[in-house]
Amino acid sequence: MSMNDINSLSQTKWNCKYHIVFAPKYRRKVFYREKRRAIGKILRQLCEWKGVTIIAAEACPDHIHLFVEIPPKISVSGFMGYLKGKSAAMMYEQFGDLKYKYRNKEFWCRGYYVDTVGKNESRIAEYIDNQLKEDEMGEQLVIPSASPFTGRK
């Protein structure tokens, strides 16, 4: 960790970095094309408004990875409540068809995964950068379904 990694607030020095993963309700694969671009733009905007720095991020079809630096004046749970609540409202505003897929405007799953980032910063950034490729490889390993009666597709 270098001195460049340390931030300051009035009389506080801090280096609070987190790897956060969260998914849409029912883990639906919704982040393709324009919805993928839209969620990226929305999350960048919301993070900027809160003073949160995005170090690395990836929108996979059925989940989001964020590697962020959150100031200590903001709790992770408070930030995630804000991020998921506002982003859901903004997605519903842009894409009216989502209302029919998700009841009661519950776009995101209730929970999320969070881990502190210590000395593994470069590894986590690399992991997030390669996450989309890993998901695609996993999907390619799926055996195509065949008819149980004829053996053909």
Located regions from the model:
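Basic nucleic-acid-binding interfaces
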Residues: 1-153
